[in-house]
């Protein structure tokens, strides 16, 4: 039993450490301290705005649990954010932007900006429970003003990061994404496709969800080669129907997306 507990703790710690590794690796020693009050929320893509809303809510919980000395629940909330909200969701979606977009592309620049924000906040959140790890990472960032993560103040998150309407919208988009992922997994299980990038999606939605999804790229959210949205048959009582097919064409050697035409992102 003791051995199992030790292995479980190691597994949990590795998850958190891997989150920091991902942040540091993508920032590539170019950490920039950002004034949260001066961030223009509207210039960020919706995905980043949604993640800032989640950070705002988690910071509220962080203060409550910290003041109540409820470190166990605090640790669980932070772990949930690292493993589900960041690793399994945000990083998964944005890895295409980070690895395949040009360094100077606006979306990539704003993604890097968000990673800077997340790294700074995570270090301050985890400092009370992972003191040595956060100090080690902080020393790599070469921030001279304070000299130690434990001399930093807890993050003060601006109120304009809180956007419940956007959160409600993304709750619906994530439901659609989950349905898409389930459909993709069925095709993978039947060996019709390998990775999700071998899939094309046809997403049938009711009128309300079509309006809600306007401007959303589900091929990006679901990591597929293509995604098309269409109106669901009025006689059908379901809100969401997903049809997944094998993508046809040539694989782009950079982003690995499959298309019958040359990849417009990487023509040069």
Which functions belong to the PLM regions below?
Residues 252-255, 263-266:
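Short cysteine-rich clusters marking metal-coordination/redox-active sites
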Residues 215-230:
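A glycine-rich helix N-cap at a beta->alpha junction
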Residues 1-11, 68, 72-73, 163-171:
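Conserved phosphate-binding loops in nucleotide/dinucleotide-binding enzymes
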Residues 1-24, 76-79, 110-135:
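Structured ligand/cofactor/substrate-binding pocket environments in proteins
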Residues 29-60, 91-183, 190-205, 230, ...:
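Acidic, turn-prone loop/beta-hairpin segments
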Residues 82-83:
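Hydrophobic residues within the alpha-helices of tandem HEAT/HEAT-like
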Residues 241-249, 256-257:
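Short, flexible, mixed-charge glycine/proline-rich loop motifs
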